[in-house]
Amino acid sequence: MNTFKPLGEALAARQASQHAINFIEGDNNERRQPFSGLFARAAGVLKHFQDCGAAPHDEMIIMVERNEQFIDAFWAGVLGNIVLVPVAPGSTDEHRAKFFRILAKLQRPCLCTDAATSARLNNYAAANGLAEDLKKLE
């Protein structure tokens, strides 16, 4: 049995395997992602994170709608030694308020989100006097 210290090593070691993650979205929509493709995608997402300024030990809020986006961002963070803070995007103002409470507690935050969630966060911030708080992410 292999033992891996960093979790990212486990994914890297399984690139040649036939194992995969199955994403099921709805009754007739299923997609299989082999570990080799997952590693390549995560490495690409990590490069994007790094190009945007994320560094090891930074805190990355992952707030995305789709499971596939979450898995890619999660493994990118693992590969980059980034502290992951998963937050459900949700559909209510309470979800957005929770995001801002979490953001206030972080020291070096980054945000991985989708366009729709970003728009909802920006609208909520503007309506609730929190626009300045979003500057912490710049």
Segments (PLM) and residue ranges:
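A short N-terminal helical cap/helix-turn-helix that marks the beginning
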Residues: 1-22, 40-42
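Conserved AMP-binding/adenylate-forming core of the ANL superfamily
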Residues: 21-75, 91-100
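Short acidic/polar active-site loop segments enriched in Thr and Asp
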Residues: 55, 83, 109
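Short beta-strand elements of ligand-binding domains
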Residues: 64, 87-88, 134-138
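Conserved ATP-dependent adenylate/AMP-binding module captured primarily in the ANL superfamily
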Residues: 89-125
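Conserved helix-loop-beta element of the AMP-binding
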Residues: 107, 127-138
